[in-house]
Amino acid sequence: MNNHIEALSYYLGAFVDELTRLNVCDVVISPGSRSTPIALLMEQHEGMNTYLHVDERSAGFFALGIAKAKKRPVALLCTSGTAAANYYPAVCEAFHSRVPLIVLTADRPHELRDVGAPQAMNQINLYGTFVKQFTEMAIPEANEAMYHYARMTTQRMIASALLAPQGPVHLNFPVREPLIPDFSLESLWDKGRGEYTGVVQRGNAVMPSEYVDSLVGRLSHMEKGLIICGDDSHSEIATFATQLAEKTGYPILADPLSNIRSGHHDKTMVIDCYDTFLRNVLLKETWKPEVIIRFGGMPVSKALTQFIKKQTKAVHIVVDESGQWRDPALVATEVVQASDIAFCSALIEKMPVMKKNDWSQMWQHINEKTKETLREMETYDTAFEGRVITDIVRVLPEGATLFASNSMPIRDTDSFFFTSDKNIQVMANRGVNGIDGIISTALGASMICDPLVLVIGDLSFYHDLNGLLAAKLHELNITIVVVNNDGGGIFSFLPQYEKKEHFESLFGTPIGLDYEHVVNMYGGSFSRVNGWEQFREEVQKGTTTEGLHVVEICTNRDENLTLHRTLWAKTQDVITTSLQGESK
């Protein structure tokens, strides 16, 4: 037998088998020649689920979506050259949103590098600081030590991806021709296992008892506190955060991505309209928390970030299992390296029930006043983009997922996704906040989260049209709501809007595309709605039938801006009147 083929088959077979043994059982593959042996072995292994995606950029985000939804590592495989470079945006997003991806790139062997060989470029540390770890795998050799090395390296890389903060890792595989493995080899998947096998087990960072006692003592004398829950908080944070709020009397300012706004838990202390009422000047000047406890990533709301930044006299406690200083407001006074659950559990156990005071009632009262005013937009007949969110939530069934694209959809979700007793998971790509790869990420998530509704703007939709292929290839179920304002709607809310002379050409960027033909090309259904009743009917139909469903609602950017400003102005008047009444 050819010694090269034997080495190739056993070495890469050990690698693939070790992936599945460590529960990395999903791989998104883009076709290519140099990655042939790994792709074939993955397809052959009974423990591996393989998903084809032709476009590497979309493939990267598709894998990201699967990993976000499954909350475990997913592998990506491509050939050498620019194919690997197309993963870059998804890798950046995975790194900053702390999602474990196992990025596998095939490469030319060392003798074909820097000599002008076709489809060869420098892939060493290709993703730079956006991966937690990089390793250049050894050329396959036919001996037990190398098979064991393949497994041990796999263990180390997966452990790195799972270690807090979670994130992507990159393995580069130089491979010589011929590239076809021999599946007739005996014990193809067993080489390198040895008598003992490694286990990658992720634990929780715990709270030192001395710190807990000290913190409990301090908090017991602080009546005015806030609990802020952002993206990527622990999946059980709702239960623990609400218990902590009940003990302390601190309101919970819940970002929509914290998934605390919806569900069957007690939401008495949950504040959902802070993005609107924290714009009020009088409120910002008079409401001064003594302590702010923050879990997860920084919230979407700019108004909340600015409010946090102004609280220079407060104690700011950032709870982060990795100990990283995610503090763009630059106000953190304490960073606690513990899991959200460990932190809450420790305080709940030792914290006495605080005396009821006016602090939490003030927040609850203003929150309800604000929500009452915001709900007036549900009477608007016009195509107001904020109502897109409330009407979707109205028809979503229990256990559904709402995926919000970046730019305006996530901001409208922040403003208009009110508390609900239905379990509705909210997802988004808030690592680097780009508008690329949104369709693909949502489609990846839809493999696990069904039904799933994606809300996306027309430019973001255009940006990832190639991603729709996954819906056709893998027969996925998804409803995509395209809010078509023919351009970049968010720029109307920014200072650039005042530069009328060049606004449309540089920022408004209308592209005037009809997406119906594209959707049909990918085997999906398309409907352009003309009223809110039809909108709700089409969204509901999409969540109860199989396949790709695209619902387009056309809006006017200038009108949408005016309606947002009108609502904000009205809420500010209501809030100011309420605050002035309380001060009398």
UniProtKB/Swiss-Prot annotation:
Gene3D superfamilies: 3.40.50.970, TPP-binding domain (3.40.50.1220)
Top-level EC class as recorded in UniProt: transferase
Catalytic activity field: isochorismate + 2-oxoglutarate + H(+) = 5-enolpyruvoyl-6-hydroxy-2-succinyl-cyclohex-3-ene-1-carboxylate + CO2
Pfam family, one: TPP_enzyme_M_2
Oligomer and partners: Homodimer.
Function: Catalyzes the thiamine diphosphate-dependent decarboxylation of 2-oxoglutarate and the subsequent addition of the resulting succinic semialdehyde-thiamine pyrophosphate anion to isochorismate to yield 2-succinyl-5-enolpyruvyl-6-hydroxy-3-cyclohexene-1-carboxylate (SEPHCHC).
Cross-referenced PANTHER family: 2-SUCCINYL-5-ENOLPYRUVYL-6-HYDROXY-3-CYCLOHEXENE-1-CARBOXYLATE SYNTHASE, PROTEIN PHYLLO, CHLOROPLASTIC
Protein family (similarity comment): Belongs to the TPP enzyme family. MenD subfamily.
Name of the protein in its database record: 2-succinyl-5-enolpyruvyl-6-hydroxy-3-cyclohexene-1-carboxylate synthase
Organism: Bacillus cereus (strain ATCC 10987 / NRS 248)
